[in-house]
């Protein structure tokens, strides 16, 4: 009997239009538990629109999206504490130290005492390979690779079940990009994460992704990287 996959994200009949332009027309996609799914596509195929739709930050014209069994609706409360997001630019707050950035979602979504929040923030930073020296710095004092890692630590702050990565290796040199890919694989294996990654990095697709979803002809085709 074929193995049954549990889907943590399910998209059915997604339609996104912008004026006369249709970006997605009846798009269907299922993301399996514990997999790393890479999403690729040319300019204008709607990679960012798809991600924003899943996160409830864009209101599709039609379709149904479920994440962790919950229907996602535009700007409505959802299972947000169960997912983490690494935005393309990192989106760290420039006026806070790295540790304070990581601590912020913990402070907003828990009643933990300050000292415990700080300890958890440092733990997340250690998890992504950053030490106490980096923790005390501000985002503009970090290298590009360290900034990505700090942003990833913040995305992991609430111990999510699903992690969304938007161009995680963009702007990194080849060595740093490879190290970041290795970190993603390590975190998936040790934290039981399901990861959805938008990327144009071919090495990432072949190095870490279990399946690749290609946006084409207003829809999507999913297969293993070697196909």
Describe the function of each predicted region:
Residues 55:
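Helix-to-loop junction immediately C-terminal to a conserved catalytic motif
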Residues 138-142, 146:
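Conserved ABC ATPase signature
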Residues 159:
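Conserved catalytic motifs of ABC-family nucleotide-binding domains
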Residues 71-84, 115:
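ABC ATPase NBD coupling module
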Residues 115-133:
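Conserved ABC ATPase "signature" region
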Residues 163-166:
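Catalytic Walker B motif of ABC-type/P-loop ATPase nucleotide-binding domains
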């Amino acid at each position: 009997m074929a193995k049954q996959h549990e889907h943590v994200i399910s998209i059915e009949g997604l339609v996104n239009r912008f004026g006369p332009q249709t970006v997605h027309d009846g798009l269907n996609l299922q993301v399996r538990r514990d997999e790393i799914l890479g999403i690729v596509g040319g300019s204008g195929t709607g990679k960012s629109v798809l991600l924003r739709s899943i996160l409830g930050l864009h209101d599709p014209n039609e379709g149904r999206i479920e994440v962790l069994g919950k229907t996602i609706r535009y700007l409505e409360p959802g299972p947000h504490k169960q997912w983490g997001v690494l935005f393309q630019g990192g989106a760290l707050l420039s006026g806070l130290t790295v540790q304070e950035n990581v601590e912020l979602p913990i402070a907003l979504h828990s009643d933990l005492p300050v000292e415990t929040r700080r300890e958890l923030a440092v733990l997340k930073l250690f998890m992504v390979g950053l030490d106490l020296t980096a923790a005390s710095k501000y985002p503009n004092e970090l290298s590009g690779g360290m900034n990505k890692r700090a942003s990833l630590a913040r995305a992991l702050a609430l111990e999510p079940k699903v992690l969304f990565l938007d161009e995680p290796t963009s702007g990194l040199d080849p060595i740093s990009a490879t190290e970041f890919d290795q970190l993603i694989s390590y975190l998936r294996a040790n934290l039981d994460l399901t990861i959805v990654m938008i990327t144009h990095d071919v090495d990432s697709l072949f190095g870490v992704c279990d399946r690749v979803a290609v946006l084409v002809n207003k829809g999507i085709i999913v297969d293993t990287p070697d196909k």
